[in-house]
Amino acid sequence: KLKFGTSVIALPLRNPTVLAKELATIDFLSEGRCLPAVGLGTEDEAEYEACGTSKRVRVSRTEEAVEVIRLLWSQDDVSYQGKHFTLSGVTVQPKPVQNSLPPIWFGGRSEPALKRTAKLGDGWLVSQAPPEEVANSIPKIKEMALQYDNHIENDHYGAIFSYCFADTPREAEQMAEPYNLRRRRDVPMRNMNAFGPPEVLSNLLDKYIEAGATKFALRPACPPEMTYKQMEMLGNHIIPRYHKS
């Protein structure tokens, strides 16, 4: 089944009580198909200041927020005293419908991010990482997760990347350029995004699957008025190959 996800939320910028309510509501409405992922956010200090916090505390704030969210999902009348958040008798309704609570996946590809995933995460959803990097990182997470006594399911590893369909890769790359996220310059964009005919996307998906990824968040990189058409092509040419009845 398709999941209802969030890409990767910049958790230090969010109020965990409000976010717990929002995600639980999505899980309730989707009958248990909410798949949230969280991360530390960008390196831009202005984003943290705009949300009333500081980049300096983003790690501890993220770890504390995850703890608060899981408490609110699993209990009523939650009281909590932390460095960043304080709750007194707070209850969130509706509760998530997933029996074991929605899995919280972590983003990030740095060594500290992999360690954080292994320690606190239920899965890993990475962006801006080519398949070979994913293949190298998954065993690291699994090994560290054992050290933290944290069980991560084998199918809880995924990737986010952009796609744009066109007759040729060159045409697709030109169309996608203004809309594609580019946060690293050391890897060619075509190695971690899919621009061109549908087979370019299916070939990249196959490489990620071979690397150990099983869940994917695909971002159409195109003019807004073309988004529906791009998603329609995804449904017609790609989804049937991987979701056979």
For each of these PLM feature ranges, what is it?
Residues K1-S245:
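Active-site-adjacent structural elements that line small-molecule/cofactor binding pockets in enzymes
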